[in-house]
């Protein structure tokens, strides 16, 4: 069994956004040479996420609205105790918790083995600085 690792780096100018990283992950799988195995993609920051969903703009807007309703941005220390530490991003931690840290996708015949409409996304909830995503491939 072999393994292969790469890191993707993002510096998203918006506070919250979703970026389709499927093509980048497909290219990393191709470079790995793995034909049968698994790829793990995980956000290496506690205010970012990697998740699988449909690449439909209306759905993305729905997610942003829903997440903002569940955990509204409020930098004051009144709403979130975390912000009493001098931080202003407690909402981003909650949004990441909802959307998840990582995804694992099967590699079959050297390709990502998705269901219909599935795509891999990087979710940013506290943007404007560099963050990384680990892409780890294991298999044969």
Which residues does each predicted region cover?
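Active-site histidine-anchored catalytic micro-motif
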Residues: 1-140
